[in-house]
């Protein structure tokens, strides 16, 4: 089931105040390390300009501030997620380094070849038009720049895949029913994670969108994956 941009916007608006808390529970805090891995990968390019697409509450955008002399822009379709992110940025006194903008990943309002690094953390599967969104990322990425994507994936190992399916069907639904004001949002996120192409299938889509030298780094036995692609 694919949701429209308006539905995605409304869904994330409804869970904006609980998103960080539940993300910590659902990933057992693992997302923090994986986002640190994104920064480590990005640092290799010595980037000056960084775009974090689907920035949400700005976790990754804020982490990028660890890279000296970098200017970071985060965009997201959800105004309320951005409000949470802006508060975090203000609390860390990073307003001069990290700027958040309401924007659409499939229609980026930036010049071509503008960014040394583009990141997308747990957002690419929510693109209404995946290929269009990836081609827009390719357009605004500078030559030799890197696209770094962190996304949920389904483990290839049968045992881990079985555990993953039980975990998503039982644990995530239970936790969201207890703590979330909109449990249906997490049901959608769980289903979209299972239906999204991962591994080699997603690599083919990245290559078709113009990227090259795609590398895959599975996390937590393949329950999440970092994809690194070059322009």
Region annotations inferred by a language model:
Residues 1-20, 168, 179:
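N-terminal, positively charged/glycine-rich alpha-helical extensions of SAM-dependent methyltransferases
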Residues 6-7, 150, 154-205, 209, ...:
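C-terminal alpha-helical "lid/dimerization" subdomain adjacent to the S-adenosyl-L-methionine
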Residues 27-48, 63:
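Conserved alpha-helix/loop element of class I SAM-dependent methyltransferases that forms part
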Residues 49-107:
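Class I SAM-dependent methyltransferase SAM/SAH-binding core
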Residues 106-117:
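A short acidic, Gly/Pro-enriched loop at the edge of an enzyme's catalytic core
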Residues 116-130:
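A short SAM/SAH-binding and catalytic strip from SAM-dependent methyltransferases
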Residues 131-143:
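A short glycine-rich, Lys/Arg-flanked "PGG" loop and its adjoining helix->strand segment in the class I
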Residues 209-231:
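Core SAM-dependent methyltransferase catalytic element
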